[in-house]
Amino acid sequence: MVMNPLKNLFLILTFCLSVFGFAQEKQKITIEYAGIAASDPEIEDGALVFLRDESQQVHFIHKGVNMWCDKAIYYEDQDYIEAFSNVNMKQGDSINMVAKYVEYSGKTELAFAQGDVILTEPQSVLTTDKLYFDRTRQLAYYNTNGEVVRDSSGTITSQIGRYYMNAKKYQFTKDVVLVNPDYTLNTDRLDFFPDNGHAYLYGPSTIVGETSEVYCERGFYDTNNDIGYFQRNAKIDYESRTVEGDSLFFDRNRSFASATNNITVTDTINNSIVRGHYAEVWRDKDSLFITKRALAITVQEKDSVYLHADTLMVTGKEDNRITRAFYNARLYKSDLAGKADSIHVNHQTGLTQFINLDRFSSTDAFAIARKPVLWNLDNQMTGDTIHLISDVKTEKLDSLKVFNNAFLVSKDTISEDGYNQIKGQRLIGLFRENELYNVDIIKNAETIRYMRNDKNELIGIQKSKSGSINIQIVEKAIDEVRFINQIDGNIFPESEFPKSGRRLRGFDWRGEERPISVEDFFKDDPPLILPKIKGLEDYIPPEEFTNEDLEKRIEEAGKATPKKINKAARNVPKKSTSKPSKHKLMPFDASKKQ
């Protein structure tokens, strides 16, 4: 480059007068300061070269943008500038961009920055190697990988990114990763608002922390407060417990999650599954609350156990877990069923308690129907409280205890209205291979029994009283009865035994209540009405950076110099060849799902 110091002043004055003359026609780039100005015959189109001096950098201004650099080449006829070395571009008080090299067109208001590009706004810092900045749309764009840092949120990286300055919104696509000290977020597409730290996730997404992992295909996450809302195949993994549902809420700070509609909670250690339509999970407390057709399933090798109630609560660590079923609780497995107001299961000891609430007094006519009841094979057992003990290792039934008002009933195999009945204060039963084989009725024992011979012919009806009774059961039928401290007893011909006396006091056959399948649990439940979940807003694919408006501005910029290469068309990103995403979220109508 040939510099003629005598021409410097003349060139600057000429440049300023030229700009002033066009100012009324269309505002062009203006020079605010240059240490040295010269022409260079090696530069095409007779462009002017501006250099800094020892006091300050070259300074240009255009429509509210200030730009400083060490060297600038200005193509006056195309109102186009190239800035080199320590370039700083500032828009207003909020946007600042630095780079090694910047091109800027005063006609299209498009800037291209390259080399250690850093764009700063009040809440975040964007770093990339190449950045396009359309001032007309107030849109910055990169497609060669970029990084955005927001102190309280973390660092976001992606292959492609946009920053909408008016909306104060980032839009990231392809290999999007948000790294925070407490978690890492991966997603296909992410909309991020630096002012409030709100992030919107689109497509398969994960948020992985030390103690939890979230998956969804549509979600919202507040990076300021560490709370989130997730939909579309959403699930949360808490180490040994997984929560799935139509809609999930997540609070990292409280280790809390809630789920709405079509919920499944899986315990991988205890091989259990809990289902319902509203749930709350407290990880640190190892607590699960679930309601709306709540169903707990304990998966066993040969036969699963099902527990249903209005409300289920599961508490305790994996090795000391307790399941509580409240309000109209029912239990079912292939050879056993039970019903009570409340059922408690201790998974460590194998104790299952069938409990009545205190509000049901013995004088309440409804209390009898609400007494806990247990069915095993053909036997029905009732009492004020029932304890069922299982062997936690073999998963087989071990023993049974009925406290207060114990009553054992089995239907006679032949007569239509005959029932074998045994009652007493307490009952203790023993199981072998999940079948009841020994029963002891303790204190104030009474019995009515239909006696039959080997041909199954009725011999008579036995009625007796004793201190206690021991019963041996073989092949599901009473084989032997032993009366201990018998007080009274006799066998009556059927014709001499009045029907009015064939029921012991407190008799209540409840065979119609016995569930014979899991589906029977829900027959008496009120109609299930699920809330309609409000879907998050649909994903709106970003428009091309090089859109029709920008193309028109570039074309218009070249009309003034038709015989020259249109510099405004330099370094404009090519249009994407990929098709817009087909992912579209419609509002949930959970009422259509059961």
Model-predicted segments: where are they?
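Bacterial N-terminal signal peptides that target proteins for export
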Residues: 1-10
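Bacterial N-terminal signal peptides
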Residues: 10-18
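Conserved adenosine/adenylate-binding substructure
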Residues: 20-22
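N-terminal amphipathic/hydrophobic interface segments
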Residues: 24-594
